[in-house]
């Protein structure tokens, strides 16, 4: 509390946090030695609400229920209901296993590692990133394409455990209860059906190296990372209770699945097979372990991923939602960029549909939406800083289809992009 020593303001009270006087705020709340204004109270409440949003509501046992986990995933990821259910149940059971082992020793609950299979741009990595945001156990993501067998140039598989250890602030006990997501797992498939042709240090060799840490072993991890040497001290991390989630696009797997069960015959009685016209995500639903073996995963590796969740192709409606609904939606990002030029950016509903259809044609999923928007808005973003009086830019379906230019709306007239100098 502070007072001004002159005039009538001698006894004026001030907020101890923001310094505003009692005349500048609606309410000033007094404590034993401090004062706080209503504005600071509201700010504190906003901070608390934001923190509560990012934390899961716990059930009676202190374990987030699958529905609670799925509800948070729904706020960030559009569609993929089945994959969300699988992940929610797996994470819920992971929590239960950890609690069970601290209370009982009669029945040992084995972990169920997860394999996520879905077309590129369907949301596999985003699901994992969202889990990392909402969980209260250590979480790390690794890229399988950077891994090699021990002794070769590249990252050892123990580096994955090191990243988890770093996420747990080098608390070994917390790291041993964490979750690891390995992306691009399909890129370490065996390069040949014949395992004895040559040494495959970045494919089958990595699968062999991952087997033990996924099953459960005590890994020796160098605290500073890098290669191991005899004089180095190691941290011992038990991976038995670490949940592993692997994800990959598995390009070409749909052909293996489609060909399974088809009988080839010749002659007049031969059956004529129509070409597969289903979408990739629909075909992935029928995946079997034998299909993964043909793709190039070794049997032991497939056996350590008992739970398989497939993701669907994103349809036009889902892609339109992705463009506008999430908190950091692409359209919102570009609208913010245009706001910096004091210009409003508007997309017609038909334009959003055209963008979604383009992404489907390119088979890039949600990942390709940004490149499409970038190409549509490139010329406008180039011209806009040099133009005066533009209040709004409207993107129509014709603009997306490259048959028209964006519409510029000025304070006193409308004009077409690129024609402003001619009519000025």
Curated annotation (Swiss-Prot):
Domain of life: Bacteria
ClpX-type ZB domain ranges (all copies): 3-56
UniProt keyword annotations, A-Z: ATP-binding, Chaperone, Metal-binding, Nucleotide-binding, Zinc
Gene Ontology biological process terms, A to Z: cell division; proteolysis involved in protein catabolic process
Xref: SMART domains: AAA, ClpB_D2-small, zf-C4_ClpX
Gene Ontology MF annotations: ATP binding; ATP hydrolysis activity; ATP-dependent protein folding chaperone; protein dimerization activity; unfolded protein binding; zinc ion binding
Residue sites binding ATP per the record: 119-126
Residues at which Zn(2+) binds: 15, 18, 37, 40
GO cellular component, one term: HslUV protease complex
Quaternary structure, from the entry: Component of the ClpX-ClpP complex. Forms a hexameric ring that, in the presence of ATP, binds to fourteen ClpP subunits assembled into a disk-like structure with a central cavity, resembling the structure of eukaryotic proteasomes.
HAMAP family reported for this sequence: ClpX (MF_00175)
Family membership: Belongs to the ClpX chaperone family.
Functional summary from the UniProt entry: ATP-dependent specificity component of the Clp protease. It directs the protease to specific substrates. Can perform chaperone functions in the absence of ClpP.
PANTHER family in the cross-refs: ATP-DEPENDENT CLP PROTEASE ATP-BINDING SUBUNIT CLPX-LIKE, MITOCHONDRIAL, ATP-DEPENDENT CLP PROTEASE ATP-BINDING SUBUNIT CLPX-LIKE, MITOCHONDRIAL-RELATED
Protein name (Swiss-Prot/TrEMBL): ATP-dependent Clp protease ATP-binding subunit ClpX
Protein source organism: Afipia carboxidovorans (strain ATCC 49405 / DSM 1227 / KCTC 32145 / OM5)
Gene name of this polypeptide: clpX
């Amino acid at each position: 509390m502070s007072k001004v020593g002159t005039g009538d303001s001698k006894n004026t009270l001030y907020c101890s946090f923001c310094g505003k006087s009692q005349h500048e705020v609606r309410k000033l709340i007094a404590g034993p030695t401090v004062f706080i204004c209503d504005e600071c109270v509201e700010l504190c409440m906003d901070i608390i609400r934001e923190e509560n949003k990012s934390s899961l509501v716990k059930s009676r046992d202190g374990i987030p229920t699958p529905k609670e986990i799925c509800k948070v995933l729904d706020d960030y990821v559009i569609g993929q209901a089945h994959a969300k259910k699988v992940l929610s149940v797996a994470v819920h059971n992971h929590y239960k296993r950890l609690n069970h082992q601290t209370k009982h020793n009669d029945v040992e609950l084995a972990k169920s590692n997860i394999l996520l299979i879905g077309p590129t741009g369907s949301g596999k990595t985003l699901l994992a990133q969202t889990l990392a945001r909402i969980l209260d156990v250590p979480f790390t993501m690794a890229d399988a394409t950077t891994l090699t067998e021990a002794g070769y140039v590249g990252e050892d598989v123990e580096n994955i455990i090191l990243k988890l250890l770093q996420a747990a602030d080098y608390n070994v006990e917390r790291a041993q209860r964490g979750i690891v997501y390995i992306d691009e797992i399909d890129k370490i498939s065996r390069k040949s059906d014949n395992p004895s042709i040559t040494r495959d240090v970045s494919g089958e060799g990595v699968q062999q190296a991952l087997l033990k840490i996924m099953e459960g072993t005590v890994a020796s991890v160098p605290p500073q990372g890098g290669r191991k040497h005899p004089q180095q001290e190691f941290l011992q991390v038990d991976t038995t209770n670490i949940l592993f989630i692997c994800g990959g696009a598995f390009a070409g797997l749909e052909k293996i699945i489609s060909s399974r069960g088809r009988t080839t015959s010749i002659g007049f009685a031969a059956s004529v097979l129509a070409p597969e016209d289903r979408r990739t995500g629909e075909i992935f639903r029928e995946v079997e372990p034998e299909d993964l073996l043909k793709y190039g995963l070794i049997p032991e590796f497939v056996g350590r991923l008992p739970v398989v969740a497939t993701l669907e192709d994103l349809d036009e409606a889902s892609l339109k939602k992705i463009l506008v609904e999430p908190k950091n939606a692409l359209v919102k990002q570009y609208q913010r960029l245009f706001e910096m030029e004091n210009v409003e950016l508007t997309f017609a509903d038909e334009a959003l549909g055209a963008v979604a259809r383009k992404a489907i044609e390119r088979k890039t999923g949600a990942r390709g939406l940004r490149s499409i928007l970038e190409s549509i808005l490139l010329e406008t973003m180039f011209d806009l800083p040099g133009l005066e009086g533009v209040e709004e830019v409207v993107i129509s379906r014709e603009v997306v289809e490259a048959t028209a230019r964006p519409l510029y709306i000025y304070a006193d007239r409308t004009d077409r992009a690129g024609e402003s100098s001619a009519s000025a």
